[in-house]
Design a protein with these regions (language model features):
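Active-site microenvironment of metallo-dependent hydrolases
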Residues: 1-25, 29-35, 40, 46, ...
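Divalent metal-coordination and catalytic microenvironments
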Residues: 16, 27, 32, 56, ...
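Active-site gating loops and adjacent loop-to-helix segments of metal-dependent hydrolytic enzymes
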Residues: 74-107, 144-166, 222-249, 269-272, ...
Length: 437
């Protein structure tokens, strides 16, 4: 190890193949951080409180899901095979108005956290209502989260008076700043078409004042862009630029219908973009110009979006589909190599959420968010390289998960949650939805 002390480390993972190489290696964790990484052949004696044998496994950084509406697990499969506006207006918004409560957000976010942890996601950017309940669920589950309170210009769950929406978001951020080192509060405006100019400006200002990220859905559909041009004479990105809302702490989610000028504005302002390939495919919204975004060196993360438009939270599935989608569309198999996508789901996603430099790499001094993948799986055999994981990875191969040095999944069991209880609570809520729908 690179330091001379002999205090035991908290957790030592041994004999695993490291994502950075092929020889068996080890990772030592202390105080929530990676203390040392190296080859087994060169490992000094390291006393450890707990040791995990990762023989036959891959040790890799945890995945970062840059966009989710975790509590929407309740609406998984509720209204499938519909266009976005009809899906939202006729099904999702009415269901939210009736069934979203603090209890629902807590338990359904816990279910999402379990699904994410058990599929190798260690950090999530979430955006919803009653976000204090989501933040509590993430804290209890031990997942790292950027939890953003939703802002929208009509009566919303927990904020019946739209004029109070930004104040409610400010209060949420103040309540959660510094409460749990794994939870970063943030602010989410639903979109430029559901939030007026004053709301957008005030919400961004609240985020700037608190020093937290600002999220919003941008240019998800062709209809949204046409509407924006009609109302504002500008694309959604151009409109946000005119309002002074684009900077490196603004995260534009979806970015499906971006033109060259939009991408230039995003690049110039240093704004981040999150792509959600499966959600955009399912709702037939289109596909984001990911190769062009990367060519402009725009910061990009990958998200699943909410369960209701995916319908799972498995980021490995997202990676494979994201890679295949663009190759098929461009008729170019060299577009978006597998390793580049895995970067976006780890270190790229971390940077996108303002956690860059601290997360997403197997390096001493990084936050200890790790996943142990069982390579003794038919789909991962033989394992020539990391590409195999991108094209063949799945939740079922995730064996152990560590977040901030804490073991949260061990031998495919979530240690932080009573999963049968979580499932039972969500089923109870679903029975109400079924009876009322």
């Amino acid at each position: 190890m690179h330091h001379a002390d002999h205090h035991p480390v908290d957790l030592l993972l041994t004999d695993g193949r490291l994502a950075t190489g092929t020889a068996p290696g080890y990772v030592a964790i202390r105080g929530g951080m990676i203390a040392a990484v190296g080859a087994m052949a060169e490992m000094p004696p390291i006393p450890a409180v707990e040791t995990i044998d990762a023989t036959g496994c891959l040790i890799m950084p945890g995945l970062v899901n840059c966009h989710n509406h975790a509590a929407m697990t309740l609406f998984r499969g509720l209204a499938d095979d519909l266009p976005l506006r009809q899906w939202l207006t006729d099904h999702i918004f009415p269901a939210e108005a009736r069934f979203v409560s603090p209890e629902m957000v807590y338990w359904c976010s816990k279910l999402a956290a379990a699904e994410m942890l058990m599929s190798g996601t260690t950090t999530v950017a979430d955006a919803y209502f009653y976000e204090e309940q989501a933040a509590q669920a993430f804290s209890d589950a031990g997942i790292r989260a950027v939890a953003a309170q939703g802002v929208i210009d009509f009566p919303a769950p927990g904020v019946p008076e739209p004029a109070e929406n930004v104040a409610a978001a400010r209060r949420f951020v103040a309540a959660w700043q510094g409460r749990d080192p794994r939870i970063t509060p943030a602010i989410f405006c639903h979109s430029p078409y559901t939030c007026g100019r004053e709301t957008l400006v005030a919400a961004k200002q609240a985020a700037v004042d608190a020093g937290v990220p600002f999220f919003l859905h941008v240019a998800e559909t062709a209809g949204e862009v046409a509407e924006s041009r009609a109302h504002h004479g500008r694309t959604p990105v151009g409109y946000l630029h005119d309002l002074g809302l684009l900077d490196r702490h603004t995260v534009c989610v979806h970015g499906v219908w971006l033109d060259e000028a939009d991408m230039d504005l995003l690049a110039m302002s240093g704004s981040q973009v999150v792509v959600c390939p499966e959600s955009n495919m399912k709702l037939a919204s289109g596909s984001a110009p990911l190769p062009e975004l990367l060519a402009r060196e725009i910061g990009v993360g990958i998200g699943t979006d909410g369960c209701a438009s995916n319908n799972n939270l498995d980021l490995f599935a997202e990676l494979a589909r994201g890679a295949l989608l663009h190759k098929g569309q461009r008729l170019d198999p060299t577009v978006l190599p597998a390793t580049r996508l895995l970067e976006l789901a780890t270190v790229g996603g971390a940077a996108c959420l303002g956690l860059g430099g601290r997360l997403g790499r197997l390096l001493p001094g990084s936050l200890a968010d790790l996943v142990v993948i069982d390579l003794a799986h038919p789909r991962l055999t033989p394992f020539y390289g990391i590409e195999t994981l991108v094209y063949g990875g799945a939740a079922s191969q995730v064996r152990d998960v560590v977040v901030g040095g804490r073991l949260v999944v061990r031998e495919r069991r979530c240690l932080t949650l009573d999963l049968p209880e979580v499932l039972a609570r969500v089923r109870e809520l679903a029975a109400q939805v079924r009876a009322g729908s």
